[in-house]
């Protein structure tokens, strides 16, 4: 079965992070159970900081802004308007190779970013997609990746800076990296490039790499459409 994409919400209808986290968990349970095929949620979030498992308290925002602790790898990062966030919830092959999964995501993102005229690449020892140091400044991260694997299926995923305000990153040490900066497609090209301009191309590239990302399978029964929980009903606690 082909990789299935669900566009959950884009500006002006931004998606609350906790509500989307509940949705991720629901879809993850269904993929594990075999009642839903491999699915990628595409979304643009309200402003939020999230902390991966390796985040330490002293790395939290200096102004006391709320942080949502989550189970992905990595450290502290920011999501907000103008950022394309993708959550691949897919079954991995056995034996599990999470590093390989992350490498394929990097390759997908880099291919998409280059299509928009930005020479992204990888940096040894650091995950995500990067623009290397030049006359404009040091190495700059344009996309972050952080995943979690449970019962052979993935959660969380990637965030690509498209047209988002980069100033919220100034309140934290993004991903725990002190000697590099952050950037976006819009900042690098000088043209406004929104998530809605990128999402179709991202879906195409993910589909082209499906065999490298996951094990295709047919769900036991046709799955219901993915829906966010009703506003105000999110159950994800701060320690999620």
UniProtKB/Swiss-Prot annotation:
Residues 229-240 have a biased composition (Low complexity). Keywords: Acyltransferase, Cytoplasm, Transferase. CDD domains: LipB. It is an enzyme of class 2 (transferase). The record marks 141 as: Lowers pKa of active site Cys. Residues 34-214 form the BPL/LPL catalytic domain. Residues 217-240 are annotated as: Disordered. It catalyses: octanoyl-[ACP] + L-lysyl-[protein] = N(6)-octanoyl-L-lysyl-[protein] + holo-[ACP] + H(+). It is found in: Cytoplasm. InterPro entries: aa-tRNA-synth_II/BPL/LPL, BPL_LPL_catalytic, Octanoyltransferase. Pathway: Protein modification; protein lipoylation via endogenous pathway; protein N(6)-(lipoyl)lysine from octanoyl-[acyl-carrier-protein]: step 1/2. Its EC number is 2.3.1.181. PANTHER family: LIPOYLTRANSFERASE 2, MITOCHONDRIAL-RELATED, OCTANOYLTRANSFERASE. This is Octanoyltransferase. It comes from Kocuria rhizophila (strain ATCC 9341 / DSM 348 / NBRC 103217 / DC2201). The lineage of its organism: Bacteria, Bacillati, Actinomycetota, Actinomycetes, Micrococcales.
